[in-house]
A protein has these predicted regions:
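Short, charge-patterned binding micro-sites
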Residues: 28-46, 312-316
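Internal helix-turn-beta structural module
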Residues: 34, 303, 309-345
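A short glycine-rich, hydrophobically flanked beta-strand micro-motif that places a catalytic Asp/Glu
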Residues: 27-29, 154-160, 230-234, 301-311
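C-terminal catalytic subdomain
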Residues: 254-256, 261-305, 316-323, 327
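Conserved phosphate/anionic-ligand binding catalytic regions in large, soluble enzymes, centered on
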Residues: 2-7, 103-118, 241-266, 270
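N-terminal, positively charged regions that mediate nucleic acid binding
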Residues: 2-28, 143
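Glycine-rich, mobile lid/loop segments that gate access to catalytic sites or pores
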Residues: 36, 54, 58-242
Length: 345
């Protein structure tokens, strides 16, 4: 429910709808969400007709913005579209008779990263942060009696201490900021006292309800990283009633680190959401991740970063770069691994 991710989800839903009816659609869709309003913009080349207002409202409703007090509500918000035709100058460099030889939709560098510290080969701190928010959303949508005050907007962050060999030692800090209903002030206490009681209640629920549910999802060696010394920051400003697009304008593509590796590896700067596969910002980053993940899963290295770069209108990448951070398990240099990747993938 974070505003930037609301925008990302709307952009991706529009992309999905175009591709569902025309698999060759070329889409670059941007979304802005703010108080009571959604603005759609971008470039599209497609034979499909999409009711963009309906798609946007369905996404907003599914996320949970369904109450007027949020000042951003699925049925009543305005949806303004300024989507137009894709540039012919770009399209002529992308489309080919052979679809497997289409040109890249833009220039740039893309990175894929993998590590064996989790079962899905994602960095542990990022994976834990995602799990916290997935579980918080699950409680809000399907087990609301556990934390009935939850609203859609939320963020999390996890800090992990590592040893000199890159192995996680313990979880140092967990940050959870979650939007919530206004708590009713009891008679005889001030608003400030009520707010403090509210913050204490939410912090207790995060520690006693949310954390155990997230911890239980992980294998024993990850569970062992949870300890009594973890520093918790739960709604550290003290109050989070005003949130969502009303509290913070959201834009597509502003959470690129959350969407990738949480600061590990590297990033070329291009966002994913709202872009069809001809946009190498997305497809090449996915391909680089696929390569890194499979090589780490195969035991080639404990950790791997794969970088590719493209020129607009050119089908093949200009280069492949590999960094195993000194954690390779084969008698090959990173350059030799890169050469194997070029021949195999």
């Amino acid at each position: 429910g974070h505003p930037d991710k609301v925008a990302d989800q709307i952009s991706d839903a529009l992309l999905d709808e175009f591709l569902a009816y025309d698999k060759n659609s070329k889409v670059a869709c941007e979304t802005l969400v703010t108080t009571g309003q959604v603005v759609l913009a971008g470039e599209v080349k497609s034979s499909a007709y999409v009711d963009v207002q309906d798609v946007a409202r369905n996404v907003i409703e599914k996320i949970g913005y369904t109450k007027s007090e949020y000042q951003f509500e699925a049925k009543s918000c305005g949806v303004f579209s300024s989507i137009h035709e894709q540039s012919g100058d770009i399209n002529r460099g992308v489309e080919r008779e052979d679809p497997y030889n289409q040109g890249a939709g833009d220039q740039g560098m893309m990175f894929g990263y993998a590590t064996n510290e989790t079962e899905n080969y994602m960095p542990l701190a990022l994976d834990l942060s995602h799990s916290l928010l997935w579980e918080l959303a699950e409680i809000r949508k399907n087990e609301n009696d556990l934390m009935p005050y939850l609203r859609p907007d939320a963020k999390s962050q996890v800090t992990i201490e590592y040893d000199d060999n890159g192995k996680p030692l313990r979880i140092d800090t967990i940050v959870v900021s979650t939007q919530h209903d206004e708590f009713i002030t009891a008679k005889g206490i001030t608003q400030e006292e009520a707010d403090l009681a509210m913050q204490k209640k939410i912090a207790e629920d995060v520690k006693s309800i949310l954390i155990p549910r997230v911890k239980a999802q992980y294998p024993a060696h990850v569970q062992a990283l949870f300890n009594d010394d973890i520093i918790y920051h739960v709604n550290p400003t003290g109050k989070f009633v005003i949130g969502g697009p009303h509290g913070d304008t959201g834009l597509t593509g502003r959470k690129i680190i959350v969407d990738t590796y949480g600061g590990k590896g590297a990033h070329g700067g291009g966002a994913f959401s709202g872009k069809d596969p001809s946009k190498v910002d997305r497809s090449a980053a996915y391909a680089a991740r696929h390569i890194a993940k499979n090589l780490v899963a195969a035991g080639v290295a404990d950790e791997m970063l794969v970088q590719v770069s493209y020129a607009i209108g050119v089908a093949k990448p200009m280069n492949i770069f590999v960094n195993t951070f000194g954690r390779a398990n084969v008698k090959m240099t990173d350059g030799e691994i890169a050469e194997k990747i070029w021949n195999l993938f």
